[in-house]
Amino acid sequence: MEYTNMMELNFLSKSQNESFARTVVAAFAAQLDPTIEEIADIKTAVSEAVTNCIIHGYENKIGIITIKAFISGNKITIEVIDEGKGIEDIEKAMQPLFTTRLEEERAGMGFTVMQTFMDELEVESTPGKGTLVRMTKYIGSDK
């Protein structure tokens, strides 16, 4: 991947770090001069990805979440990575309303939210090894 700037952030999978992570990514994205709506989209998608790591990847145990962000032209690509339990069936997990946490009244909309607010979404996962969520947002009208 070619890029003109990049950042990497590692933090513990604690819920209080979710807002920190989205703020850091939003600050990094600011160099592209996004609209308020574009920044809100990025922050929402990052929040969902980080929350998925905390709740599903590490199942509320402490692990490391890594965020990498890359800028190329008018595009920001964000990777949210955990080394948690992984996803057995990515296609099923990405279906709206699918949740493995019925007892916790989870909405099952995390991936749907990410897809809605970002222009591209890719998920790579290996059960027992972890998950990588790659999201891309084009800033401005040109994709």
Swiss-Prot record:
Q: Can the keyword Membrane be found in this entry's annotation?
A: no
Catalyzed chemical reaction(s): L-seryl-[protein] + ATP = O-phospho-L-seryl-[protein] + ADP + H(+); L-threonyl-[protein] + ATP = O-phospho-L-threonyl-[protein] + ADP + H(+)
Coiled-coil ranges per UniProt: none
What does the record give as EC number? 2.7.11.1
The scientific name of the source species is: Thermoanaerobacter pseudethanolicus (strain ATCC 33223 / 39E) (Clostridium thermohydrosulfuricum)
User: What is the name attached to this protein's record?
Assistant: Anti-sigma F factor
Gene3D superfamilies in the cross-refs: Histidine kinase-like ATPase, C-terminal domain
By its UniProt entry, which NCBIfam families does this protein fall under? spIIAB (TIGR01925)
SMART domains xref list: HATPase_c
- Report the record's Gene Ontology biological process terms: asexual sporulation; negative regulation of sporulation resulting in formation of a cellular spore; sporulation resulting in formation of a cellular spore
Enumerate the PANTHER family for this protein: ANTI-SIGMA-F FACTOR RSBW (PTHR35526:SF3), ANTI-SIGMA-F FACTOR RSBW-RELATED (PTHR35526)
GO molecular function ontology, one term from the record = protein serine/threonine kinase activity
For this UniProt record, give its keywords in alphabetical order, as a comma-separated list.
ATP-binding, Kinase, Nucleotide-binding, Serine/threonine-protein kinase, Sporulation, Transferase
Instruction: Describe the task this protein carries out.
Output: Binds to sigma F and blocks its ability to form an RNA polymerase holoenzyme (E-sigma F). Phosphorylates SpoIIAA on a serine residue. This phosphorylation may enable SpoIIAA to act as an anti-anti-sigma factor that counteracts SpoIIAB and thus releases sigma F from inhibition.
The entry assigns this protein to a family as follows: Belongs to the anti-sigma-factor family.
